[in-house]
């Protein structure tokens, strides 16, 4: 366990560096995620956001640095290693099997079995009951049966199913990669509500988005990357403006703006 571990830290990434060939994607980036916290991870295209979360989710290796989960140093070889440590990633396309029901998608690959288990029969009734509870917990107010195929759901509802799956399997950290992209206004507000409900249920989130307005509505703290480096941390959206953060993202100094 790292000597300066804080008990409220879920994840700590220290001095993460990553090269793609000769191109440096990340340069000594350090971040922490605390319990019951929604982090907004912002930056322009090429800033390093996607690379950072792929490293944290076990999807790509890194060249140097350290990752700690609850103070324990880890080395993820693949995404299953990250999931086993309580890190679940929800991508823009939700990674759901549209032909299967909501309940089957929630438990996909981790289906409960009927007793005796030697027959390997899935307990569909148990899955339906738990999926119904989860839909209400994330904030879906419509009466959608858990047997409904995912193909019948809207984009926002599909994101809710993915969030529900992460919540059910006790993920400490849910990484949301562009969860509101290509969604309408009403669906976007629904997804933001689902994210808040996840935090209120004891989960932390990293929220990656290009739309700063969405980020400001839901996060507790903002981290900004630029050209592979962390340029801002501990930004409180209640104490800062969207314009302030935009200037940090683009590299325009606030003192220069004041002189104009």
Residue ranges: model-predicted function:
Residues 2-260:
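Glycine-rich phosphate-binding loops of nucleotide-dependent enzymes
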């Amino acid at each position: 366990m790292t000597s300066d571990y804080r008990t409220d830290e879920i994840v700590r990434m220290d001095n993460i560096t990553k090269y793609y060939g000769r191109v440096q994607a990340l340069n000594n980036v350090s971040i922490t995620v605390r319990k019951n916290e929604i982090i907004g991870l912002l930056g322009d295209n090429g800033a390093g956001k996607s690379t950072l979360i792929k490293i944290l989710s076990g999807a790509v290796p890194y060249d140097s640095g350290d990752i700690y989960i609850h103070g324990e140093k880890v080395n993820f070889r693949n995404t299953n290693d990250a999931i086993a440590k309580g890190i679940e990633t929800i991508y823009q396309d939700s990674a759901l099997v549209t032909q299967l029901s909501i309940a089957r998608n929630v438990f996909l690959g981790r289906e409960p079995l009927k007793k005796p288990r030697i027959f390997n029969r899935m307990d569909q009734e148990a899955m339906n009951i738990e999926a119904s509870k989860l839909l209400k917990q994330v904030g879906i107010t419509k009466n959608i049966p858990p047997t409904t195929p995912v193909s019948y759901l809207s984009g926002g509802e599909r994101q809710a199913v993915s969030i529900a799956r992460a919540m059910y399997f006790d993920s400490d950290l849910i990484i949301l990669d562009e969860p509101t992209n290509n969604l309408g206004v009403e669906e976007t507000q629904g997804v933001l509500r689902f994210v808040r409900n996840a935090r209120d249920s004891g989960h932390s989130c990293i929220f990656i988005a290009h739309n700063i307005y969405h980020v400001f509505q839901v996060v507790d703290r903002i981290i900004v990357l630029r050209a592979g480096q962390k340029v801002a941390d501990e930004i409180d959206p209640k104490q800062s403006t969207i314009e302030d953060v935009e200037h940090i993202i683009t590299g325009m100094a606030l003192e220069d703006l004041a002189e104009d």
